[in-house]
């Protein structure tokens, strides 16, 4: 269970006056999310949705308040194990030249010790099956559609079997059909694992029926957290899409104050609070889920050794390099082209610089000509050497950036 109690986040403001010395991005946010639950965090742009997600993950540390997981304070007590937390960004982080199966297998090798064990293949097959990627296992990432890439992003985080799965805009930018499919997948992932909580930050108010609860943020304040079916009634609108338009009718502080007065009654009515939840209430509240794949029991997840991770990164990089013909030719051009350029610029070699004689000719004109010739030889040699060095620096930088 995830609980937040009066969470506040303040950051330095842009001005020097007392009024704008600090900016309050989150203000007195309190909520409870029970296990096996799918939560949507919605709200207009800049309302604090992603900021709240970053506070939950620990990327940002709250200024005040408490965040609790299974009753323990995540700030002052034991934090979540890295394997217990999954964070899915909006855009794919998978490599285009790897296949779906290779991408997931590489993530498992980097984040678990399942590689070269009997548990590796069953765990990999389960992740492919539960995310609907079994038939796409041999396809390369670059040919996947937007919705399929979102599924792959979820699969990459499931390698550690996280109990807290946080999704940042994974349904944004998709067509209605793909958005509905990803939302149903999130609902499926929230079931089966006895402790799992799935949270999705989204702008869209479509497909809300597949969420167990909806949290509405406005100007850094929590102004509603309840079931989707009660959303329109609470805000006095006919359609969920009208919620955003009515937010400007009242200040954010009034919305938050109104919700704080009703929060306990809503939580008791809909069974969000563990203190009042009973097995009978839970069974009645939950509808039977169809097509739920039985949860695969993962062994205790531990991070692999640093050397193991390094070898996996090098192996993956070599595989990508061999498949990218343009990179192969680019590196060959750099490695072979540089010596050729050196040969072109110094085809006759760099002539040795003669030292200027200490003997001064009595003829001033001859002496000045000697000095000018010596300086010209120095300038030519210096320009050639510095130019070659600069070219080498540029080529090495390009190779390093491409490898990175």
Label the predicted regions.
Residues 119-136:
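Conserved ABC ATPase "signature" region
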Residues 57:
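Helix-to-loop junction immediately C-terminal to a conserved catalytic motif
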Residues 91, 96-113:
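Q-loop/switch helix immediately C-terminal to the Walker
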Residues 154, 182:
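Hydrophobic anchor residue at the start of the ABC signature
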Residues 157-158:
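ABC ATPase C-loop
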Residues 140-144:
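Conserved ABC ATPase signature
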Residues 2, 25-26, 82:
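Conserved structural motif at the start of ABC-family nucleotide-binding domains
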Residues 1-6, 11-22, 44, 66-69, ...:
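Topological signature of polytopic alpha-helical transporters
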